Amino acid sequence: MSSKLVLVLNCGSSSLKFAIIDPANGDEYLSGLAECFHLPEARIKWKLDGAKQEAALGAGAAHSEALNFMVKTILAQKPELSAQIAAIGHRIVHGGEKLTHSVVIDESVIQGIKDASSFAPLHNPAHLIGIDEALKNFPHLSDKNVAVFDTAFHQTMPEESYLYALPYKLYKEHGVRRYGAHGTSHYYVTQEAAKALNKPVSELNIITCHLGNGGSVAAIRHGECVDTSMGLTPLEGLVMGTRSGDLDPAIIFFLHDTLGMNVGAINNMLTKESGLLGLTEVTSDCRYVEDNYDSKADAKRAMDVYCHRLAKYIGSYSAQMDGRLDAVIFTGGIGENSSMVRELTLNKLALLGIEVDAERNLAARFGKSGFINKEGTRPVLVLPTNEELVIAQDASRLTA
């Protein structure tokens, strides 16, 4: 075991993911998830030394109770592990325009995360709680906390990609522009794709698709992001689990003026009641959609809209590749595991010279990476992401 392990924290609005990782080799010594915060069934699950355990946190518990449990109960089982933690890495969804790369956390960074909270109101306030609790529980690491931003990798986008066609003063005065998300994942699979394709990252032209409950596509030219599907917030772009993705902005006026919905209700609908959930009227789970595609109209409808939107983005981003597209990459929970999403999407992209090999496509699931295209056709690659490792490596590098 290395003496320089990193505790990685990912605080969501109602959950906390945590892991202790060796940044040198990626070995994971502890991983866990606390969820259902503020509810009677708040609970925590973890895996330590290969053994899975679970406990109730108590009704109404949240980030504070979860981190306290991790330190005083889980790590108490293995004090030598706690002693090896040399840094803490925090996943931060939105860094705005000021926080453009991973950075050691100080008061100015905390203020920057607060300033960007209006662009990620569900996530950034939760991240700030996580930082505060980490500082309380690990006072000896007060100068070893590092923020890693989901928006950072997309900061190489040119102006024509990140500006909206709105009055320019909205950007100049209020930072209204496209920022993207899932940048840590897009960055990781870009590095891995370079290895798989045996190319230097700086020569790589790829389109990366991070598909999970949230989803985004990125255009990577010469190893740098030049466009991505999420915008000012993670609501823009693809069809997602419960998020609408792209829509005509005038739909909002229709919902308000004609149907009498208030702004809060519209926001709730677009973020929590749309996407696969809205299209099926049953669930946000892609597995339901895949399992029932041939037998239920709601599942077919949702899958077809999902794949149509995804194919449109891949097709449009091919125009940004300077005439050479090296590969299309799939990652994230759906991207790594749904052979159906990949096949139905890629079948729409014959113009790009893409042909799916059915056998390879079925094989590249459940943590297995691999090429899924037919030999001699445009490379398409499934790569499991590892955002936690990137966060651990950045935290280790910046606090060394």
Curated annotation (Swiss-Prot):
List where in the cell it is found. Answer: Cytoplasm
List residues binding Mg(2+). Answer: 10, 387
Superkingdom of the organism of origin:
Bacteria
Reaction catalyzed: acetate + ATP = acetyl phosphate + ADP
Q: Can the keyword Metal-binding be found in this entry's annotation?
A: yes
Provide the transmembrane region boundaries. none
Active site residues per record: 150 (proton donor/acceptor)
**Molecular function terms in GO for this entry?**
acetate kinase activity; ATP binding; magnesium ion binding
Q: Name one GO biological process term.
A: acetate metabolic process
PROSITE patterns (UniProt xref): ACETATE_KINASE_1, ACETATE_KINASE_2
Q: What Pfam family does this protein match (any one)? A: Acetate_kinase
Q: How is the cofactor bound?
A: Mg(2+). Can also accept Mn(2+).
Q: What class of enzyme is it?
A: transferase
EC number annotated for this UniProt entry: 2.7.2.1
| Residues binding substrate | 91
Annotated pathway: Metabolic intermediate biosynthesis; acetyl-CoA biosynthesis; acetyl-CoA from acetate: step 1/2
HAMAP family per UniProt: Acetate_kinase
Q: How does it assemble?
A: Homodimer.
Q: What does this protein do?
A: Catalyzes the formation of acetyl phosphate from acetate and ATP. Can also catalyze the reverse reaction.
**Name the record gives this protein:** Acetate kinase
Q: Which organism is it from?
A: Erwinia tasmaniensis (strain DSM 17950 / CFBP 7177 / CIP 109463 / NCPPB 4357 / Et1/99)
Which gene carries the instructions for this protein?
Answer: ackA
